[in-house]
């Protein structure tokens, strides 16, 4: 009986562990951007929604649905991925952010961050940037 219980426990642990490793395979969730100015297909160089309260609201929701699993709730990283509250403000931070959401992050053939622009609109991603600037902290 004890062996049977130990085997059952080991199988449950294995099944749970597999789910943890698979979290990176989820499909990004769609983001509703009604109320934001349409931006078109060509990416802008700077965040057009900076300090826009509607964009911050949309960005907070989009962040929680698509980014928090790796970057932490309320953008407070638990160490898995960079703390996005520390991104540089303004145009310099926009440049880095844009490059990362368009190209993702791949090292040694491993995908650390998907190309989010393949899944979410420019409007949604700039809204996330607006949210991140609203919760930014200085080191």
Model-flagged regions — what are they?
Residues 59, 63-73, 113, 128-132:
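The canonical Cys-X-X-Cys-His
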Residues 23-29, 78-85, 103-136:
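Axial heme c-ligation environment in periplasmic c-type cytochrome domains
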Residues 28-62:
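Electrostatic cytochrome c docking/interface patches
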Residues 56-58, 72-102:
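Gly/Gly-Pro-rich "capping" loops immediately C-terminal to redox-active cysteine motifs
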Residues 50, 91, 119-120:
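Short, conserved sequence motifs enriched in acidic/basic residues, glycine, and aromatics
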Residues 62, 137-139:
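Short sequence/structural segments immediately N-terminal
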Residues 15-19:
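N-terminal signal peptide c-region/cleavage motif recognized by signal peptidases
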Residues 1-10:
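Bacterial N-terminal signal peptides that target proteins for export
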């Amino acid at each position: 009986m004890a062996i049977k219980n130990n085997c059952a426990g080991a199988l449950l642990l294995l099944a749970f562990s597999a789910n943890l490793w698979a979290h990176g395979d989820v499909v990004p969730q769609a983001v509703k951007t009604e109320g934001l100015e349409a931006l078109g297909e060509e990416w802008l160089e700077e965040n057009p929604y900076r300090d826009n309260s509607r964009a911050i609201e949309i960005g907070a929701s989009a962040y929680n649905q698509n980014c928090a699993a790796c970057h932490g709730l309320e953008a407070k990283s638990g160490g898995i991925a960079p703390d996005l509250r520390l991104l540089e403000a303004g145009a310099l931070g926009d440049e880095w952010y844009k490059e990362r959401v368009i190209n993702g992050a791949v090292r040694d053939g491993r995908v650390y961050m998907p190309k989010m622009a393949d899944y979410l609109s420019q409007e949604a991603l700039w809204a996330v940037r607006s949210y991140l600037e609203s919760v930014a902290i200085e080191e």
